[in-house]
Amino acid sequence: VERSRGLGDVYKRQVLGLYYVPGGEGDPTPAYSSMEFIMTQLPFGYIIRSIHHWTTHFMVAAVFLHMCRVYFTGAYRNPRELNWLIGVALMFFTIFFGYSGYLLPWDSLAFGAATIGINMANSTPLIGGWVATAMFAGTTISGQTVTRMYFLHVFILPVVVTSLILAHLFIVWAQGIAEPH
């Protein structure tokens, strides 16, 4: 499922990335303005963004259903524990992909989601401040928050997820498909 969606997703990101502005000099206002431009003035912009939005929902559902299938058939057992852990990491990064993309329009919903996310990060014992700074460019919401999410969503997460998918598929290829237990 992930691989068949990959090239179309790359194309959609390139088109959306040409017109999206995460903000400049700590001001997130251009993010909302550029999203408004994509949705209202760019030819087929509404369709491209909607396809990107809905395929994201499909991706999260597909990964979740795949994890359920692996769990209920017992395919995570010996000798496939490492592949299960990679799959759990892929599920986490898929959800974080959706979350980081959810913040990019920087409307009132995105601001609320960022507030919840930064409060959750700050409440993590011992490493909360570091986690908040790494994810949101500070321990409070600032103009750099949307820029950080854009950077994670467009540059870091695709590399991490693609690497994990390749490792996941390589292990499946090396060990073979698990028989249900």
Where are the model-predicted features located?
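Membrane-interfacial loop-to-helix junctions in multi-pass inner-membrane proteins
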Residues: 4-5, 71-92, 108-116, 147-152
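Membrane-interface interhelical loops and short amphipathic "cap" helices
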Residues: 17-51, 102-151
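Membrane-entry segments of alpha-helical transmembrane domains in multi-pass membrane proteins
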Residues: 4-5, 39-61, 78-83, 142-159
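Hydrophobic alpha-helical transmembrane segments of multi-pass integral membrane proteins
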Residues: 9-17, 54-67, 87-99, 157-166
